Swiss-Prot record:
It comes from Xenopus laevis (African clawed frog). This is Pyridoxal-dependent decarboxylase domain-containing protein 1. One of its GO terms (biological process) is carboxylic acid metabolic process. GO terms for molecular function: carboxy-lyase activity; pyridoxal phosphate binding. Belongs to the group II decarboxylase family. Its cofactor is pyridoxal 5'-phosphate. Its EC number is 4.1.1.-. Residues 26-56, 673-695, 702-721, 726-782 are annotated as: Disordered. Residues 26-48 have a biased composition (Basic and acidic residues). Gene3D superfamilies: Type I PLP-dependent aspartate aminotransferase-like (Major domain). It holds the Pfam family Pyridoxal_deC.
């Protein structure tokens, strides 16, 4: 296996297989039983799936199948849209921990108990020291919400003494209340209530600040009033979930004041958030440092340190181990304690310096991006960074709206969300290693978020990636500004032209949306809708074939508007009027061609029927003229030899344009086939006159105007230089003829000297008069 695995394409799978193979050899220590050949009857059944039939497959085949499944969808995706996780050596240690946990679980019970106790105690001690959480216990769980669920069970057991015996009957008389911030993860409170079997009335969402402080932090004064109201109503305030780094903006609640409030009303304080990672740094802000005094906190070390498939950890303080066991925070099964093994291996591999370096690197990346954003005036950070958060949230804001009176402020606000959505998608596609994503904030709207603590260790984000992100942002800002500035002009141009309808779709970030309205008298709505769909599809195809920088599409697949043309982002020199006129002209042409094709089909069908009638009539006339005897094979040949028919055969041609049967007499007379009427020339737009290399829908820039002025000036200088040349002498008779209206020499004739004999020669000689080309050129220029 060791020799065959390195031949695999995926280096990660090959390296993991190699590490597992070496680890198994070291642990087994030559105690593997000799492999005996498997003899016997192979049982096969038709209902058994193919991969399970037979005697099984080797490890290489199974890993090859896993590799194919992992990389099957990557061929359909572009490389820029993929986010490849950076699985380093520390990641291999975490993956190795899962395999070792499975191997250790087969040890004898006494060895397993000692080993799991050592692993669990070491990991818990290390985490409590790293994150400044003294005298704490740890619970390791796969789902990051499971820790909060177990803590809620612990608090219920602590506050309701008869809960173990009476169950939910105890809760009925005095309902528990769980307080959760409005800025917490969506669905967190509902998930806890569903798992605990509590009604949603036990969940109280605490609003954030509206007047003072950050709008993403919990309103402490309002929370105090809510707790007092619940106590007066006979309810039991149970637990408060606070944030040290909200999921959206990364802000930290006032944990110090919240802890005092919880101590006053005997409420359990649970804290979670990305800012808890900064507790491992040497300098920690006071707002985050207050989290060390809380009753429990949840840490997600996997994304923070780039460790795949490691469990989340909930640190908590409680003195009664029996209640912790009843709540599920501790387990008597040694196998359950092996969840900490991947972390136990990874933390030892990284060491204290490696852990601090990864968290510090993420904080430095966010500060670097924040400093660069200050130099970009159109990009704003609507959520002020409180200094303790590594999360950067920014948003594009059009500054020209205040100075430009033609733009509607309400329209710009509605379009800004779509533009920022487009901006976030573009940045994520252009710089996938940056890990930027899009977040919807309640007051600020759609924003772009850079959260390096959750992505940089996994994606391997570097300072160069941040610089590339800023460069892409600078490149996209002019496109956003030009598109937003031309939106109103595009709407006016579309509404000005009959046959086009402007569609208000604020979810589209491009120039705009329009629909081509056909001039049809069709009464059937389904037929009219089908015709419009055909015209729209053909129009989109022709527009995408044009040489232009614009993009045209049919919009979202499940959008509300159908048969529309969605126009993408615009450049500064876009000629909106030419664009709209071109779309209208193309739509009319497609509609007329389709209508002409339908009419031609009907005309041709009628013409064919009429031609069949005429041909049958001609056959009957020929039969009457020639007689019946001439139609008999042998007799007809004899009669034709004795008395040949003198009638000329009548040829016929079918005119597709007119749909009629015509004679071929003119064809035989003129010895050429007539083509009928010449179709009228296709009208060309004045906008079609473009310079060489210039794309469609582009306004002429100042450079092109200056070039035309320079070319005209140089042409005049050339004319003046030609007039300054000495004029050659020529015959006076030619001058008289020219003065009388007879042409002397045109410009075309002067290009090749021609011999013109003079009529009035005193000596009657035929000497030619050869005019000069320069003379004719100068006369024509004058």
């Amino acid at each position: 296996m060791q020799k065959q695995i390195p031949q695999m394409v995926d280096p990660t799978l090959a390296e993991m297989g190699k590490n597992l193979d070496e680890a198994m050899k070291i642990l087994e220590d030559n105690q593997r039983p000799s492999e005996e050949e498997k003899d016997g009857k192979k049982y096969t059944r038709k209902d058994i799936p193919g991969p399970l039939q037979g005697s099984g497959q080797n490890m290489v085949s199974v890993l090859q199948l896993v590799q194919n499944l992992m990389h099957d969808d990557e061929e359909e995706q572009s490389p820029s849209l993929r986010r490849i996780q950076n699985v380093g050596e520390q990641g291999h240690m975490a993956l190795l921990g899962h395999s070792l946990a499975a191997y250790i679980s087969v040890l004898d019970r006494e060895h397993l108990r000692k080993l799991t106790t050592r692993i669990l105690s070491d990991t818990t001690l290390w985490l409590c020291r790293l994150f400044r959480y003294d005298n704490g216990s740890a619970y390791y769980h796969e789902d990051d919400r499971e820790g909060l669920l177990k803590v809620c069970r612990l608090v219920i057991h602590s506050r309701y003494e008869d809960y173990t015996t009476d169950g939910f009957n105890v809760l009925y008389n005095k309902l528990p209340v769980i307080y959760i911030s409005a800025a917490s993860r969506p669905g967190l409170g509902q998930s806890v209530c569903n798992q605990l079997g509590l009604p949603l009335s036990c969940l109280c969402r605490v609003p954030c600040n509206t007047m003072f402080g950050s709008q993403h932090e919990m309103d402490v004064a309002l929370l105090d009033r809510l707790i007092k109201d619940d106590i007066q109503s006979g309810k039991c305030p149970l637990l408060l979930v606070a944030n040290a780094g909200t999921p959206g903006a990364g802000h930290t609640d006032k944990l110090g004041r919240l802890k005092e409030l919880c101590d006053q009303y005997n409420i359990w304080l649970h804290v979670e958030g990305v800012n808890l990672a900064t507790l491992a740094l040497g300098y920690v802000s006071s707002s985050v440092l207050a989290a060390t005094k809380c009753d429990s906190m949840t840490l997600t070390l996997g994304p923070w340190l780039g460790l795949p498939a490691v469990p989340a950890v909930t640190l908590y303080r409680h003195e009664d181990p029996s209640l912790s066991l009843a709540a599920g925070l501790t387990s008597s099964q040694p196998v359950e304690k092996l969840r900490a093994l991947p972390l136990w291996l990874s933390l030892q591999y990284l060491g204290h310096s490696g852990i601090v370096e990864r968290i510090k690197h993420a904080s430095q990346l966010s500060q670097k991006l924040l400093e660069n954003l200050k130099n970009l005036s159109p990009v704003k950070t609507p959520v002020e960074n409180d200094g303790s958060s590594p999360v950067v949230v920014f948003r594009f804001v059009y500054e020209g709206c205040k100075s430009d009176s033609t733009l509607n402020l309400s329209t710009i606000e509605r379009d800004s969300d779509a533009l920022n959505q487009w901006l976030g998608d573009q940045l994520a596609a252009l710089v996938p290693s940056s890990g930027v994503d899009i977040v919807e904030l309640e007051d600020e709207g759609t924003c772009v978020r850079f959260n390096p603590l959750m992505t940089c260790a996994v994606l391997g984000t570097t300072a160069e990636d941040v610089e590339q992100l800023v460069a892409c942002l600078r490149m996209k800002i002019p496109v956003l500004e030009n598109t937003l500035r031309l939106k109103e002009e595009f709407r006016q141009e579309v509404e000005r032209i009959a046959g086009l309808s402007y569609i208000n779709d604020y979810s589209w970030a491009g120039l705009g949306v329009l629909r081509y309205e056909q001039f049809s008298e069709e009464q059937d709505a389904a037929k009219r809708e089908a015709d419009l769909e055909k015209i729209t599809v053909a129009l989109l195809k022709k527009l995408n074939e044009l040489e232009t920088d614009l993009t045209f599409c049919s919009g979202p697949e499940f959008g509300a508007e159908k048969n529309c043309i969605y126009i993408g982002m615009a450049s500064e020199d876009l000629d909106v009027s030419e664009l709209v006129e071109t779309i209208t002209a193309m739509g009319r042409e497609i509609e007329e061609n389709s209508r002409l094709l339908e009419n031609m089909t009907e005309v041709v069908r009628k013409g064919i029927l009429e031609a069949e009638v005429q041909l049958n009539k001609a056959n009957e006339e020929r039969l009457l003229e020639e007689g019946v005897l001439r139609q008999i094979p042998l007799v007809g040949s004899m009669l034709n030899w004795l008395s040949p028919v003198q009638a000329t055969p009548k040829g016929r041609t079918f005119n597709l344009t007119a749909g009629s049967l015509e004679t071929t007499e003119m064809t035989y007379i003129s010895k050429a086939q007539t083509t009928g009427l010449t179709p009228p020339p296709t009208p060309t737009s004045a906008h079609g006159k473009r310079q060489a290399g210039q794309k469609l829908f582009k306004r002429l820039s100042r450079n092109s105007d200056a070039m035309s002025e320079t070319s005209s000036i140089s042409h005049l200088e050339e004319v003046e230089s030609l007039e300054a040349l000495p004029m050659p002498e020529y015959d006076s008779s030619a001058a008289e003829n020219s003065a009388m209206g007879e042409p002397f020499a045109t410009a075309e004739q002067s290009s090749t000297p021609s011999i013109v004999p003079t009529e009035t020669s005193s000596e009657g000689s035929q000497e030619p008069s050869i005019p000069s080309a320069n003379t004719a050129e100068s006369d024509s220029l004058r």
